[in-house]
A protein has these predicted regions:
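Sec-dependent bacterial lipoprotein signal peptides
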Residues: 1-20
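Bacterial Sec-dependent N-terminal signal peptides
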Residues: 14-38
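Peripheral peptide segments
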Residues: 33-45, 87, 93
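N-terminal edge beta-strand
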Residues: 42-56
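Mature extracytoplasmic domains of secretory-pathway proteins
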Residues: 58-105
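Short, solvent-exposed, Trp/other aromatic-anchored flexible loops in extracytoplasmic proteins
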Residues: 99-129
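Surface-exposed edge beta-strand/loop patches
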Residues: 119-145
């Protein structure tokens, strides 16, 4: 009887160990609208239409930006995020980004556009956060991962 209780206790412990979660560390990258292009040549050569960044907020692995620009309705605007590939050797490290807006609308009305970008390509091995400096945005953003 003593061995029976011991075996039941061992089986119960083994059963409890099976209830651990296997998928809690899976990143959700589907929620961002687009990627960041990490390319210094594109960063240097890209020209943008005029815009104003209203907000830039990091949530999980997504940078959510809200911009304002003139146009007819903003439906054909193309907004992209470029990284310079330059990494400032500070602690935490810093990266330099640029938003590129292609706006071929010739109207004088002002519209806003929201878009998100997947920041996971900007991670740096050996650290768990990076400071992001977006051109023409006054605040540096801290991306923790």
């Amino acid at each position: 009887m003593k061995y029976c209780k011991f075996i039941i206790l061992l089986l119960f412990c083994a059963l409890l160990m099976n209830f651990q979660c296997d998928n809690d560390d899976v990143r959700q990258t589907d929620s961002c609208d687009g990627p960041v292009l990490v390319d210094n040549t594109t960063y240097q050569m890209s020209e943008s239409s005029f815009y104003i960044v209203i907000t830039a907020i990091i949530e999980d692995d997504c940078l959510n930006v809200n911009i304002s620009s003139s146009g007819c309705d903003g439906s054909i605007w193309d907004l992209a995020l470029r990284d310079s590939e330059d990494i400032a050797e500070s602690m935490p490290p810093q990266r330099y980004l640029k938003l590129i807006l292609v706006n071929n609308e010739d109207c004088l009305a002002v519209f806003n556009k929201e878009q998100s970008f997947d920041l996971s390509e900007l991670r740096i091995d050996g650290v768990n956060q990076v400071i992001l400096n977006i051109e023409d945005f006054p605040e540096a953003l801290r991306y923790s991962y």
